[in-house]
């Protein structure tokens, strides 16, 4: 799609959102190398991108896999060197990195989510807390969205690389993209949550989507960040997601990337509307950031779908 058409549709969405007072902080559209258009309804700021973080964390894992430090078949048992708690469910040893990346660990509930963490869930030791949980279903069988799965995947990366997740992410992703040290939520023992709460500005947040749009290469410098094969695999349907009436939740899930209801499209997606959608056939990325807790998230998501993403892809 040419820039002029994309900008016209973008401007229409901005005017529509302004006219209706939709609670949006900022929205941007770009290709693999630059921002085509950007609008801030409020002053641009660094803010939590919530579960959009998961796509950054899984990319770090994809890099480690490309380096031969991990495989998708490595098991959670490796993190504790085969020394599971005596009362642990024996099926925990069967949970693979693939299961964690596809939200199919088998724990059967959403653990270490925002409300739980704020209430002290998992303290003081998140890893021990999860290793004492029963496995409800066979690992790898059913999708169940849980930030605990991403946290455990991050602990597997730390075990394999000998680095904290934040350091590895900075060295292999943030620094090459020209970004600073990741400000991130950590557990009481200093391990990054993995699945939530990196803080970024709008156009920083969407950089990982621009890298994926370009097959793993950061176009402004020509530097490869992650293997093209990982980009293709991570953004392909790896597991089915439950039926939903909302826009885009039932299209399937990759490795911490949601599939979207547009041709070949996928997205990194965080609570309250922190979203970067990749539209490969149009060569575009659309990113949006929204405020917390106002109850309008579904309205904004639907408007984004109807007024910008659908017109861009039809």
Question: Where do the PLM segments sit?
Answer:
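A short, well-structured edge-of-sheet supersecondary motif
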Residues: 9-43, 276-277, 283-287
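Active-site SXXK
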Residues: 33, 48-73, 100, 153-157, ...
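Structured C-terminal helix/loop/strand segments within mature extracytoplasmic catalytic/sensor domains
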Residues: 270-314
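Active-site Gly/Thr loop motif
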Residues: 181, 232-286
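Active-site-proximal alpha-helical segments within enzyme catalytic domains
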Residues: 152-156, 196-218, 274-290
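Flexible glycine/proline-enriched surface loops and loop-helix/loop-strand junctions
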Residues: 42, 134-139, 149-151, 187-193
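Active-site helix/loop module of the DD-peptidase/beta-lactamase fold
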Residues: 67-107, 132, 160-200
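Catalytic tyrosine of NAD(P)H-dependent dehydrogenase/reductases that use a Tyr as the general acid/base
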Residues: 50, 143-145
